[in-house]
Amino acid sequence: MRHFLTLKDFNKEELLEMIALAQKIKAQTKQKQFVPYLERQTLGMIFEKSSTRTRVSFETGIYQLGGIGLFLSANDIQLGRGEPMKDTSRVISRMVDMVMIRTFEQSKLEEFAAYSKVPVINGLTDSYHPVQLMTDYLTMIEFGKADDPICAYVGDGNNMTHSWLMLAAKLGFELRVATPKGYECDPDIVADAMEIAKESGAKITFGNDPKEAVKGCDVVTTDTWVSMGQEDEKEIRLKAFEGYMVDEAMMSLAKSDAIFLHCLPAYRGYEVSEETFEKHAEVIFTEAENRLHAQKGIMVWLDQHC
């Protein structure tokens, strides 16, 4: 049985198999062909962090695959009242066919998976957001930016950055990361990614100059400067990230046909300008839709590898 906790757990071929499934299922969906790959299966969806895209995409996705989604907030189950994660896992995994968890600590997700009898999917943790990176790569393919791309991540060294590191390392493309001093990536995750990159041939570089990172890139991406749970740091962060807003001046340094990706929600006037966001809106909202299709590919792949 396999879980989907971080991209680190898969080889290149397996990740591309999931992407291929996502492409196939998306094409079928567009033709109104809803193939019941997961007929009568139940997806338990545990949310300790709220979300728009994660809930809608997983709940819609499992339904389109012939199953049903069961939404469980921390307040709906005993987990929110102190039941140990391992006990919650041993109960829920006896009643459903797959579990998606959106939570804070990666360790909680891993504990749940360790005791689960069914596949577990990382819907987001403070350390990683792997379903989003599968989504982003699917979007890159659709917009012709997946053939030996040069990608730049500009902003906070957070769960999105960590997942970009793993995707680049596994697939072997070039990634440039620019973060303000003091907001760099987790050094342990960086070490893991760099070790993997030695085998794949990926070129991963780090710096504190966003303009230098973006030069000649095919793909530019960023994320919010203030993630959930960091609201008390907002003013300090806004000052630290001055000069990191992706605007037309910054995008002009990338290739003329470069695309801009954002996992949403976007805060215009902070990490991205209104003009740049709207100029790349078709890509961004295709990316948002692709959460649905990428996650269906992941769920079907996991079911096939139980």
UniProtKB/Swiss-Prot annotation:
Binding annotation for L-ornithine: N159, D223, S227, M228
GO CC annotations, alphabetized: cytoplasm
Keyword line: Amino-acid biosynthesis, Arginine biosynthesis, Cytoplasm, Transferase
Chief location: cytoplasm
GO molecular function list: amino acid binding; ornithine carbamoyltransferase activity
Annotated EC: 2.1.3.3
Keyword Cytoplasm attached: yes
UniProt binding sites for carbamoyl phosphate: S51, T52, R53, T54, Q78, R102, H129, P130, V131, Q132, C263, L264, R291
Catalytic activity: carbamoyl phosphate + L-ornithine = L-citrulline + phosphate + H(+)
Entries under PROSITE patterns matching the protein: CARBAMOYLTRANSFERASE (PS00097)
GO annotation terms (biological process): arginine biosynthetic process via ornithine; citrulline biosynthetic process; L-arginine biosynthetic process
UniProt keyword Transferase, yes or no: yes
HAMAP family xrefs: OTCase
Assigned protein family: Belongs to the aspartate/ornithine carbamoyltransferase superfamily. OTCase family.
The protein's role, per its UniProt record: Reversibly catalyzes the transfer of the carbamoyl group from carbamoyl phosphate (CP) to the N(epsilon) atom of ornithine (ORN) to produce L-citrulline.
Protein name: Ornithine carbamoyltransferase
